[in-house]
Amino acid sequence: MLYYVNKFLSNSKVQAVILGIIGLATISMLVSYKLDDPSFNSATTGYTNNLLGIFGSYLSDFLYQFFGVAAFIIPLSCFIWGKNCWQQKYRKSFIRISVMLLALFSTAALLSNFDLEFVPSNGGGAAGIIIFHFLKQFTNQLHLLLVFFTFIIFVVLFEIKFTSLSSFIIKLGKFLAYKIQTFFYNLFSQLTLPKLFSGKANNKIKITPSYTKPVNEKIRFTEEPKPIMAKPAPVNPIKFFNKPTVPKISQNDATALPPISLLRNPENHHIKGASSSELKQKAEELLTVLNDFGVKGQIINIGQGPVVTLYEFEPAAGTKTSRVVGLSDDIARSLSALSTRIAVVPGKNVLGIELPNKQREFFCLKELIETPEYQDTSTLLPLVLGKDLAGKPLIADLAKMPHLLVAGTTGSGKSVGINAMIVSLLYRYTPEECRFIMIDPKMLELSAYDGIPHLLTPVVTEPAKAVVALKWAVKEMENRYRMMSNIGVKNIAGYNTKIQEAVKEGRIIEKSIQTGFDPETGRPIYETVAMNMEKLPFIAVIVDEMADLMLVAGKDIEMLIQRLAQMARAAGIHIIMATQRPSVDVITGVIKANFPSRISFKVTSKIDSRTILGEQGSEQLLGMGDMLFMGNTSKITRVHGPFVNESEIEQITEYLKETGTPEYISAVTEQSDEDDSSIDIGDGTSDEVLYKKAVQIVRDERKSSISYIQRSLRIGYNKAANLVEKMEKEGIVSPPNHTGKREILLPER
């Protein structure tokens, strides 16, 4: 019984009605008060004129005696509180009581100097007289009247337009702060100070943008990659310089980090969320829907985020999780919601039911780049993913992933998410520290970055060149491994640290290479050669549409991606691979096994969601940047991505093009004669090479079956059948006999 009473009284409409009744009753007994009615000061037994009878007569006399005419503040406050409850505008209880008491005692003290005939005491009652005479000994009467009048004006502003007034003051303060910050930034960024104490390397004054990184920071890799939700840390990012296989950028053309002013400011930062009563009401509706489908339980916690609200539902004993998860579409229909996602909350005995908010918060990339989480130096390659369900910034470290697989349909926000990741790297590293290989078969998404100095080659749009670029990345990885092996380190962090220490000490690191053999003893002859004393940069390989490449050169692309994904982490080469068709022929088992970190934007079906994440749920996302992020701990987190528009990308790329000139490496997309040319990329040259290799296999192995050639060349059945038919036409093999076997007409070697 008590539960239902509390539930009834917790309703905002009921609270508003109760406050209205109390206010109406109080003002009725105050208005109908008569001096000759029975009261504490009058012992008459006559008829009472008060509308509330003998109770109203005594209570109104007490209020007049103690507060005077200021007693009308009490019913007025009840009316205002009731109106706020009806409109679901809440303030904390102690704030309500404090404001009412301030208004009550200020009005009583202000009216204590006036004598009124219709009240038993003066205009302010006993409380007004005590307060006024107590404060009068510290100042004169006029000052007191002004102070009490000011308090009353403050209370009126607080109750009527406090929210609008405070919002205006906050916006004005932010606007002025932004203008002052921009003025000083532009002023100091244009100053050029001469070098002081020339000849001393450690005595320099250097003015750098606020996001430039100091050198000499030790790099560390950990084994448990996970999204970073770090505490604020000082901005002290790591900095690398040049590399042996990538051409240096001259000091005159050194590119500065783009200023934060190129990104637009957030617009709708203050979106009103649902009130506590609305959340409770929605929770009750959710429980009703679950009960209708035979699922019992209770909601133990409600967490409201910028896009969705998480209801933690604890099912009754014996309830299967799959039964509740299967009701997601029915719950969305019953609650008139766009979609509903249900998943187990890690570490808790509850199911998380995520319902979209009425008003969705959209946020910009700028506010996330300005967060301490992005500036944390322990995040080596920060990727701005967005905000989690609680609205906290989520910054992932690509160096710890170490590769990322992204999937999502058209309009899901996949391309915007890729742009946000690229921009987050551009705001952390210069071309001397991080280089890109961008592969865009669609020729649309990554074309905006063509010409920036971070690129090792122009944006690759041809599948044939994409294969060559990936082969170059494999060669670069192997070359880096040899360099790291020569100085006895295991990763790029140790290599850069040793190079940096040697440069500080003025040493030259040498390596031994074999130049031949001793003609007398036959032993190998070694010579000592000085190594290149330049640091190695990170290399990020961005593939925007994997499906197009898999259709043209599937087997070769898969082998190259597999090799890079398995070994390139220690060499500082990382892959971000995206596709809008997450089917099993694009995201194969080999690729999934080597990409433990994955992001799924909205997809069309549960099958696609299981393909990319291993479980359903991506089909229930809201689109426009709503995503599920799975780190290599297999924990799935819902994230809402930031928005970065094309004009911001254009401004950033134009700034980078003006401050630095790219120096491309032609070998990235040009296949050399030493490369293995047996890659099936769909052009005439590749078919001819395959045919020659097939003929060689038939001559050497004396086997001409289609399946044997298919296995030997690692090609499809149709391609192998075409090669055998061509050999039959050219007289290399005979037509099949009655058993299907062919005779090899070429002579043995």
From Swiss-Prot:
Record-level Gene Ontology MF annotations: ATP binding; DNA binding
GO-annotated biological processes: cell division; chromosome segregation
Gene3D superfamilies found in the cross-reference section: 3.30.980.40, P-loop containing nucleotide triphosphate hydrolases, Winged helix-like DNA-binding domain superfamily/Winged helix DNA-binding domain
Keyword presence, Nucleotide-binding: yes
Domain FtsK: 391-610
Comment text on domains: Consists of an N-terminal domain, which is sufficient for the localization to the septal ring and is required for cell division, followed by a linker domain, and a C-terminal domain, which forms the translocation motor involved in chromosome segregation. The C-terminal domain can be further subdivided into alpha, beta and gamma subdomains. The alpha and beta subdomains multimerise to produce a hexameric ring, contain the nucleotide binding motif and form the DNA pump.
UniProt family annotation: Belongs to the FtsK/SpoIIIE/SftA family.
Name recorded for this polypeptide: DNA translocase FtsK
